[in-house]
């Protein structure tokens, strides 16, 4: 797979068609993906993407990447940084279209994001979380060397659910670092960060 900064025309058809959803429900509230009206679902989702872009600083930013397979958009992978300039920590959020799940793409796209954050941006630690019954996401974290980091509670579709938290340090990532992931445009982004 290939990831590129999100362009608004690539992914809305998947959101509109409900291909981002799964059972058990994987997203916490409020989540635009739970909207029953397809147009409202797309509109609210795009608003959240643009909100993330609008709150940008060297400390706090959200980078949204479209995931492409053979040139076709199949999902999204976000890098979410808070206090990045002082702590070097970040989290991730992702989704895949229902018709490409179970092929290892979740692991590949998270691997690409980790490579960007650690090798490209100099991050020190990655965090992730998922509802305990989100087997796919939790398996990806475990496969990539994340360590369990406690449990918490969150709300999904109005009901409480247990969350599994994960953390991956730079030193652990280094032992699993891949040499087949290429980064492009990172120096320009780092320059942009330095000037804001």
Q: Which residue stretches match the model-derived regions?
A:
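Charged catalytic carboxylate motif
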Residues: 10, 109, 136
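Conserved GNAT acetyl-CoA-binding A-motif
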Residues: 119-129
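Surface-exposed, gly/pro-biased binding rims or lids
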Residues: 136-140, 144-147, 171
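Conserved catalytic-core motifs of GNAT/GCN5-like acyltransferases
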Residues: 127-129, 145-163
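Conserved beta-strand-loop-alpha-helix junction that forms the acyl-donor binding cleft
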Residues: 128-138
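Conserved G/P- and acidic residue-centered "switch" motifs that form tight phosphate/ATP-binding loops
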Residues: 71, 104, 134
